[in-house]
């Protein structure tokens, strides 16, 4: 009697060996539409060949890490240099990776806030926040700011500002590199009023020693530890 088929797991997901530049990767190309099409084209053009070789792609190693382990890894893998994040977002665009998954600005803000833990007074239990989701969403916000198309830039810029302000005001969740790069992206894309700048400056930490300690401690990868509401600002 044959055994029933088991659902596919991450471990059993087929991967394709591809050399990008000088580096060989084993990749689940279903997550990267451009490479999926590239492999299909090469396989049809050269049926006997099992070697897939692509020219170098800028910051591909970091882009792949973000796809496989969560976009929060992108902030951890790059310096707080907006130009590098521009390159990375352009690479995701080139690879046709759907970073935003059709999410609206409101949905992105909601996911940013998902990192906040809470306390259920009726059941007397703590409700853990999902830091991983919130930190991954911070990169989605960055991508939206850098490459997003806005139908009403004046109206949407206010919504984006609220998201950025929430992010920079929650240092327990969003570490220094994230806060620095997302703020820089907003200030590059939109006109920042004096009032908005003052609101952002209120939450800026400038002590180099403390920032270095914070940056060095941003190493969690799988289960990010829970936290609870840490500022007096919310949107």
Predicted regions and their residues:
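Canonical BTB/POZ domain core
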Residues: 3-5, 10-114
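Alpha-helical protein-protein interaction/assembly modules
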Residues: 76-89, 98-235
């Amino acid at each position: 009697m044959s055994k029933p088929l088991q659902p596919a797991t991450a471990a059993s997901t087929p991967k394709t060996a591809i050399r990008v530049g000088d580096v060989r990767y084993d990749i689940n190309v279903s997550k990267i539409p451009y490479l999926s099409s590239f492999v299909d084209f090469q396989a049809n053009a050269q049926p006997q060949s099992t070697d897939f070789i692509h020219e170098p792609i800028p910051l591909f190693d970091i882009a792949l890490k973000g796809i496989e382990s969560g976009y929060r890894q992108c902030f951890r893998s790059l310096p707080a240099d907006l130009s590098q994040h521009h390159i990375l977002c352009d690479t995701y665009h080139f690879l046709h990776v759907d970073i935003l998954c059709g999410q609206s600005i409101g949905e992105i803000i909601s996911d940013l806030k998902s990192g906040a833990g809470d306390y259920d007074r009726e059941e007397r239990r703590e409700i853990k926040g999902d830091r991983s989701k919130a930190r991954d969403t911070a990169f989605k916000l960055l991508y939206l700011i850098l490459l997003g198309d806005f139908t009403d830039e004046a109206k949407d810029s206010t919504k984006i500002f609220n998201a950025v302000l929430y992010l920079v005001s929650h240092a327990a969740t969003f570490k220094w590199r994230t806060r620095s790069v997302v703020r820089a992206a907003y200030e590059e894309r939109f006109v920042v009023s004096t009032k908005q700048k003052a609101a952002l400056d209120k939450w800026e930490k400038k002590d180099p020693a403390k920032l270095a300690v914070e940056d060095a401690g941003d190493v969690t990868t799988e289960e990010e530890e829970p936290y609870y509401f840490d500022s007096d600002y919310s949107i």
